[in-house]
From Swiss-Prot:
It catalyses: S-(5-deoxy-D-ribos-5-yl)-L-homocysteine = (S)-4,5-dihydroxypentane-2,3-dione + L-homocysteine. It is an enzyme of class 4 (lyase). GO terms for molecular function: iron ion binding; S-ribosylhomocysteine lyase activity. This is S-ribosylhomocysteine lyase. The gene is luxS. Fe cation binds at residues 54, 58, 128. Gene3D superfamilies: S-ribosylhomocysteinase (LuxS). Its cofactor is Fe cation. Its EC number is 4.4.1.21. Binds 1 Fe cation per subunit. Belongs to the LuxS family. GO terms for biological process: quorum sensing. SUPFAM superfamilies: LuxS/MPP-like metallohydrolase. Involved in the synthesis of autoinducer 2 (AI-2) which is secreted by bacteria and is used to communicate both the cell density and the metabolic potential of the environment. The regulation of gene expression in response to changes in cell density is called quorum sensing. Catalyzes the transformation of S-ribosylhomocysteine (RHC) to homocysteine (HC) and 4,5-dihydroxy-2,3-pentadione (DPD).
Length: 169
């Protein structure tokens, strides 16, 4: 099985909260696609609650689009990581890590403005596979933690696993 890009970086050295360009690619027509690792918490040290990350999934996707989409950027998808330490965001365009970090912080401010759980988008059995597994309170706790900590940048060159380490795994 091929080694995926996300497993060539040293998770023991990742900062969080932090933005990382996980991958750059181009479509056959030359459009730039960028995948970002939006690391909410340090791998193997902390984890996002299942209800909190699920509620963030519903809120974060729309709020990030509000703050980042524009003439040169269009978000394709924002999905939670299976390890529950963050989200991957795929988009058309090449915004800077700082632009993404600023949009992320603004989106977290938006999460704090949601007053009632009933305001969570698509919170029903027709549009959500586990619509009862949500917690606005937990999502807002996560948002407060991100705002308090600020968002830094993780760079692939700083996190790259050596061929020797990869060969021994």
């Amino acid at each position: 099985m091929p080694l995926l890009d996300s497993f060539t970086v040293d998770h023991t050295r990742m900062n969080a909260p932090a933005v990382r360009v996980a991958k750059h690619m181009s479509t056959p027509k030359g459009d730039a696609i960028t995948v970002f690792d939006l690391r909410f918490c340090a791998p193997n040290k902390d984890i996002l609650s299942e209800r909190g990350i699920h509620t963030l999934e519903h809120l974060f996707a729309g709020f990030m689009r509000d703050h980042l989409n524009g003439s040169n950027v269009e978000i394709i998808d924002i999905s939670p990581m299976g390890c529950r330490t963050g989200f991957y965001m795929s988009l058309i365009g090449e915004p800077t890590e700082r632009q993404v970090a600023d949009a992320w912080l603004a989106a977290m401010e938006d999460v704090l403005k949601v007053v009632e759980q009933s305001e969570i988008p698509e919170l029903n059995e027709y549009q959500c596979g586990t619509y009862e597994m949500h917690s606005l309170e937990q999502a807002q706790d996560i948002a407060r933690n991100i705002i308090a900590a600020g968002v830094s940048v993780n760079r692939n060159d700083d996190l790259k696993l050596s061929d020797e380490i990869l060969g021994n795994l």
